[in-house]
């Protein structure tokens, strides 16, 4: 069995809040959202809410930890059920699973302001709020307005995207009527079609939006900004065979050095190494790396993927 030896690196995780009253269709929307990206995502279930994803979408891959239980979704997303304190749960996920995005689905009666306050206490350069999303049930809107208007007003105050669910057959005019009833301000995105018909740019903006939580007097405010996609450079791949490394400390140093961008913008490193009849596998993704024991020997080689690779320097590093 492979066993972790070293895990180092920074964490950068964006939190996407998806709220809505009981039965609004949050889980169905989350499933569609996850299917629209290849990014690494964790969905959190804890005392603020119950995820209740249908069993057919879950694999029972419990990791047997007492405080945090993990299931893997069929499309590679991870669902967490935890009995830790809410903020502790977020920090634990950031430092153990380290996803690009954490989707939090609170219960249908959770106070969103309280959740955002807690997120603010742990927001820093490596954890930030993403786009808050409100799911509005078109079939149950009158009931919510008549009986739970305070709850709905709280949610409308802290969102950047309003999604009308159960609206597959609605006309654009009917969407506009709901927008007017809710008095959605111009700062919130309000698509006039069901999300199954959205163009890719709406889905991309969900992942590209960053939020800053601010205190204005006694009130909280969220300032949102869409980060435009940069022009992507074509990734290059470089393979080095028969690498010459005889100490794990040296390998650890090399992987840290590769993150410095002195030998290129390196996105991924994967390799195998044998030292004193012990076999190891090493991986680097972004600013995180891991060295683990390997049951089998696969030689001494490394594959480096990135842009602007300084191949001569890379070869020197792994061959001396």
Predicted regions and their residues:
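Short, Lys/Arg-enriched N-terminal segments with co-localized hydrophobic residues
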Residues: 1-12
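Short, hinge-like loop/turn segments at secondary-structure boundaries
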Residues: 59-62, 121, 150-152, 180, ...
